Amino acid sequence: MIELKGKPVADDIKERAIKRVEELRSQGIIPKIATIRVGDDPGDIAYEHGICSRAEEMGIDIKQKVFAGNISQERLLAKIAAYNEDQDIHGVLIFRPLPKQFDDKTICKALDFRKDVDGITTGSMAGVFTGSGEGFPPCTAEACIRMLDYYGYDLTGKKVTVFGRSLVIGKPVTVMALDRNATVTICHSRTTPEVLREAGKNADVLITAVGRANFLTRDLTGEDQIILDVGINDDGAGGICGDVDPQAASAAAAASPVPGGVGSVTTAVLMEHVVTAAARSALQEK
């Protein structure tokens, strides 16, 4: 089994983006991302640290805002509005899921889609589903496609099965695979066991984003498949694991590990989106 590691993919994206950052800085444009975190979720904090490190490596400025977990929705909306108006900020990332007192749709709708570098707004989603190129796709969904591209897997004519139908990964990665001329089946919580097994065994590429440890067992997979594991789960021993059972992964032709796979590409894609947003902003100002 070939291990599809994320680091070389992330490094390739980073190197290309750094050249663009240098070009923008030579024009007096400094790419900048603002992050908004509500509360002290350990996962959010870890992701935030990763963003800070990556931004520093790439010459991207970052502005961090942390709110207590009990703030009102009005305060959060006010901060988003301020960042929408700040011309020095090119991208805004809101750590989600938010605490229960927030209406997620209202928060996402409040963000200017031109600064939506993680694809959470309807404007960005429309760009993904119509192929208009407006906004940005969700970073993790794009990371899946970028990994396949980097390792030379052409999806043209291939059968792809996606496990999970969220707006963050499942639905957008389905559309992005279709755009690369794949035939895509999407499975979800209401898919019958028989259909689930058939869809898993008959695919050339499997992408799983269910969020359940060992979900994708060997009896759901076929032979000589490519598996991208997007799941991040508690392994019960203080670490993390993906959705793919080890036996299923070892039987694949190639599979991404967790950790060290798709997740490590996500932050690089996010930074690339910030750079692109900065370049677009510069063109609009001319």
Question: Which role does the model predict for each range below?
Answer:
Residues 91-155, 197:
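Anion-binding alpha/beta catalytic cores of soluble intermediary-metabolism enzymes, centered on
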Residues 38-52, 135-226, 238-248:
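Glycine-rich phosphate/diphosphate-binding loop of Rossmann-like nucleotide-binding domains
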Residues 30-39:
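Short beta-strand segments enriched in small/hydrophobic residues
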Residues 97, 209-212, 231-232:
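Short glycine-/small-residue-rich Rossmann-like dinucleotide-binding loops
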Residues 105-125, 228-282:
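Rossmann-fold NAD(P)-binding glycine/threonine-rich loop
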Residues 55-69, 184-187:
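Short beta-strand elements in bilobed, periplasmic/extracellular small-molecule ligand-binding domains
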Residues 75-87:
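Short, well-structured alpha-helical segments in soluble
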Residues 1-29:
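Positively charged, low-complexity intrinsically disordered leader regions
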